[in-house]
C-alpha cells in the first residue's frame, strides 16, 4: 500500500506527455467523470473519475495520471480499482524522446493486491500531422506483482505471494480528428515479463460540446496472460464520460 500511495503522489505532482502531439502548452490535460458496465472477473455497473495533466518546459516534460472506478450491487462491492502513473520525458528532437516511468495499480477483483512498474525507454512520434498523430514507446524496467491470497476450496488455500521480474514495456497512442469537433483515439499498452503479460487497449470517440466540455464513449479491454487461479484472463469495460479539457 505504501508503494501505491507513493505512485499516486508522484502521479499527482509529476505531469507531462509521453507523446507530443500538438505544439506544447505549459499546462494541458483533462478531468473526467464516467459511468459504465464492466464484464469479466466482475459483472457490474460502476462509476469513476480520472485526471490527466502534463507540463512542459523547454525540452523537459512531466506527466501524471490518476484514475479510479467503483461499483456496488445490492450493498455488495463489485468493483474497486485505482491506478496512478508518473512520467518524465526529455525531448531529443521534434519526434524522438527519452523517458522514465513509474506506475501502480490496485484492483480488488483482479487476483492481485497491487502491481507496480518502474522503467526507462525511448518514444518516437511516427505521424505528426494536424489531424492525425501516432506515437510509439518502448522500454525496460522492473515489475512487481503482489498476488492476493486465494481460497480455492474449503480445504485448499493458496497464500499470498510476491513476483518480481524484469519487464518490457511498449505503448501506442493514435489520434485522428474526424472533424473540428470529433476525434477518434486508440491507445494500447503492453507490459511483458517472464511471469505474465498485461495488455490493454482503449478505443474512444470524443465529441466537443461547448467550451472545454466534451462527451466521450469508450471501450476498454484488458488481458492477463497468466491470471491467478480462479480468475479470468480478460475484462472489458464500456464507459460514457463527461470530460473537461484543461489548456
Q: What positions do the PLM features span?
A:
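Membrane-embedded beta-strand positions of outer-membrane beta-barrel proteins
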Residues: 31-33, 64-66, 100, 120, ...
Amino acid at each position: 500500500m505504501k508503494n501505491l500511495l507513493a505512485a499516486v503522489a508522484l502521479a499527482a505532482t509529476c505531469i507531462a506527455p509521453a507523446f507530443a502531439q500538438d505544439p506544447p502548452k505549459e499546462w494541458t490535460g483533462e478531468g473526467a467523470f464516467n459511468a459504465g458496465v464492466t464484464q469479466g472477473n466482475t459483472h457490474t455497473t460502476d462509476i469513476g473519475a480520472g485526471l490527466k495533466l502534463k507540463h512542459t518546459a523547454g525540452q523537459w516534460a512531466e506527466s501524471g495520471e490518476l484514475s479510479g472506478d467503483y461499483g456496488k450491487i445490492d450493498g455488495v462491492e463489485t468493483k474497486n480499482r485505482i491506478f496512478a502513473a508518473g512520467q518524465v520525458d526529455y525531448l531529443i528532437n521534434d519526434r524522438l524522446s527519452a523517458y522514465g516511468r513509474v506506475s501502480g495499480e490496485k484492483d480488488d477483483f483482479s487476483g492481485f493486491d497491487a502491481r507496480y512498474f518502474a522503467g526507462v525507454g525511448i518514444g518516437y512520434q511516427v505521424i505528426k500531422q494536424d489531424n492525425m498523430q501516432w506515437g510509439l514507446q518502448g522500454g525496460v524496467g522492473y515489475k512487481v506483482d503482489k498476488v492476493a491470497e486465494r481460497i480455492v476450496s474449503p480445504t485448499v488455500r493458496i497464500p499470498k505471494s510476491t513476483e518480481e521480474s524484469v519487464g518490457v514495456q511498449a505503448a501506442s497512442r493514435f489520434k485522428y480528428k474526424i472533424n473540428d469537433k470529433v476525434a477518434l483515439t486508440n491507445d494500447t499498452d503492453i507490459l511483458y515479463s517472464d511471469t505474465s503479460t498485461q495488455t490493454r487497449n482503449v478505443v474512444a470517440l470524443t465529441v466537443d460540446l461547448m467550451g472545454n466540455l466534451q462527451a466521450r464513449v469508450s471501450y476498454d479491454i484488458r488481458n492477463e496472460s497468466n491470471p491467478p487461479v480462479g480468475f479470468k484472463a480478460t475484462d472489458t469495460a464500456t464507459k460514457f464520460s463527461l470530460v473537461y479539457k484543461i489548456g
